[in-house]
Structures are given as structure tokens and as C-alpha cells.
Amino acid sequence: MNPLWSMSSGSVRKRAEGEEKTLAGDVKTSPPRSAPKKQLPSIPKNALPISKPTSPAPAAQSTNGTHASYGPFYLEYSLLAEFTMVVKQKLPGVYVQPSYRSALVWFGVIFIRHGLYQDGVFKFTVYIPDNYPDGDCPRLLFDIPVFHPLVDPTSGELDVKRAFAKWRRNHNHIWQVLMYARRVFYKIDTTSPLNPEAAVLYEKDIQLFKSKVVDSVKVCTARLFDQPKIEDPYAISFSPWNPSVHDEAREKMLTQKKPDEQHNKSVHVAGLSWVKPGSVQPFSKEEKTVAT
């Protein structure tokens, strides 16, 4: 036998036995290396101490619950929506116009066409709270105090809180206040009056009440051409009849065609009609024969 072969085979056998012992025994692991500690750089001399950041101040809130920076835009949008609703309601005999200087002030006038206050023309001003629609109800003051149980004889203010004790957002609207101001002249309420004299006369002496109402209407009519109490370009004012100005406008109003008539003329009727005009009987229209 070759001696080199016997030596190599012996060494291989010893190495295999050693590996078996190593596998059969516990697995030896090397001890973990300790990582070097991180050190912060030294603080330079004359360095100022670091102060903790202050917590941000809470966002300012406006009176209507929105962010203060959005408050004016939210209020303007709310008032624009309110005025749009007033226009869509088409309140009979009631006309309003927002002020040029403040959207919180509206000028208006009410025309009474029948009843105890017939022929009355009453100018008024609506004052809207600056925290609308989360505040109280708007105030309505007549330019000239009207003789009425619900109108203060000194200030001319209408008792609006009677109908809107608590203004409810998204439920109450300004057009309802205007409708209420119109309704009080047709349906008289004398409970808890602002003008006790008017309430007593309405209950005890209706003829004297009517006489004072007629006098009040005459006073308002006589002062109809007075300058507005508030100097504003959009304030409602009346002027005497001027033919050079008003005749042309009246003619246009009288000759203006109704929307229904214009719509009917613009509709193209297709096909033939076998119904005689003014009749509902089928085939009542006589057929014209062509001579041959």
C-alpha cells in the first residue's frame, strides 16, 4: 500500500470524525462585538441654550364657527344666497335692494293693495346681524312709524321676534321676515303690542282705529319723496312723475309680450290638424278639395 495514500485517508477520516463531533455537540458562536458608543460633539463656548418650541396658537374662530379668515367670505355667500331666495319667491308688493356700502343693510318698500292699510306705501330698512345666520333674527324698521299694534310708534321697528323668537340657521330665511312684514298689514294681531293704543282701538273702537290708519297712510304717502334716511347709492327713493323719463318705461312695460305668448309662437307645430279651432271633436275640420 502506498504510504501517502494511507496518510491521506487517515487524515480525512480524522477530519470527518471531528466534524461529526462538532455537529453532534453544541454550536459555538463567536461573542458579539461591542459597537463603539456614539458621542455628540462638544458644546462650543458662549453657545446659547436651546429653547423648546412653543405650541402654535389655536386657530382663530369667527362668531359663526368658521375660520376667522373665511368669515367675511362665508357671510357674503350666505347673504347672496338669501337675496337669491328673495328674488325667486316673488313676494307680492315687496321690493328690496341690498345697500351699496354694507351687505348687512337692505332697503325695501311694501305696497299694500287692499284691506285696512290699502294704498299704503311703506319704506323700511332691514338690519342683519354681523354673525348671520347664527345670531338673532334681522331687525326691520319702517322709515316712518306706521300706526299698527306691532310697530313701535317712536322707532318704527316691527316686532319681528314675535314670529322668530329664536333664529334657526338653515331653517329661517330673510324672505320669511319680509313676508311676515307684509302679512301683519292684512292680519292684525293685538297680543303683547308695541303700540298699546293701536291694539286697544282695534279691539274697542274699530272706526277710530281705521281713521288713524288712514291718517298714517296719508303721512307716509305725503313723505314718499323725502330723501332716504341713510345716504347710499342703492337706497330706494321715489320722484314725481316725469313724462320724459317714465312714459317710455311705462310703454315698454305695457307692450312687453308675455313669456307664454312668445313660447307658443316659437313652437313649431308639425303634422296636420283635423280638429276645428274651438272644437274638441275629432275630424271636425272641413277638408278642402282641390278643383281639377
Curated annotation (Swiss-Prot):
A GO CC annotation given for this chain: nucleus
Stored CDD domains: UEV_AKTIP
Function: Component of the FTS/Hook/FHIP complex (FHF complex). The FHF complex may function to promote vesicle trafficking and/or fusion via the homotypic vesicular protein sorting complex (the HOPS complex). Regulates apoptosis by enhancing phosphorylation and activation of AKT1. Increases release of TNFSF6 via the AKT1/GSK3B/NFATC1 signaling cascade. FHF complex promotes the distribution of AP-4 complex to the perinuclear area of the cell.
Domain of life: Eukaryota
Protein name, as recorded: AKT-interacting protein
Region annotated Disordered, chain positions: 1-64
Entry-linked InterPro entries: Ub_conjugating_enzyme, UBQ-conjugat_E2_core, UBQ-conjugating_enzyme/RWD
Family: Belongs to the ubiquitin-conjugating enzyme family. FTS subfamily.
Domain UBC core: 74-222
Residues with the Phosphoserine modification: S30
Subcellular location(s) per record: Cytoplasm; Cell membrane
UniProt organism field: Rattus norvegicus
Keyword Cell membrane: yes
Subunit-structure text: Component of the FTS/Hook/FHIP complex (FHF complex), composed of AKTIP/FTS, FHIP1B, and one or more members of the Hook family of proteins HOOK1, HOOK2, and HOOK3. Interacts directly with HOOK1, HOOK2 and HOOK3. The FHF complex associates with the homotypic vesicular sorting complex (the HOPS complex). Also interacts with AKT1. May interact with FHIP1A.
Keywords: Apoptosis, Cell membrane, Cytoplasm, Membrane, Phosphoprotein, Protein transport, Transport
Residue ranges, compositional bias (Polar residues): 1-11
GO molecular function, one term: ubiquitin conjugating enzyme activity
Database matches in Gene3D superfamilies: Ubiquitin Conjugating Enzyme (3.10.110.10)
Compositionally biased region (Basic and acidic residues): 14-23
Bilayer topology annotation: Peripheral membrane protein
A GO BP entry: apoptotic process
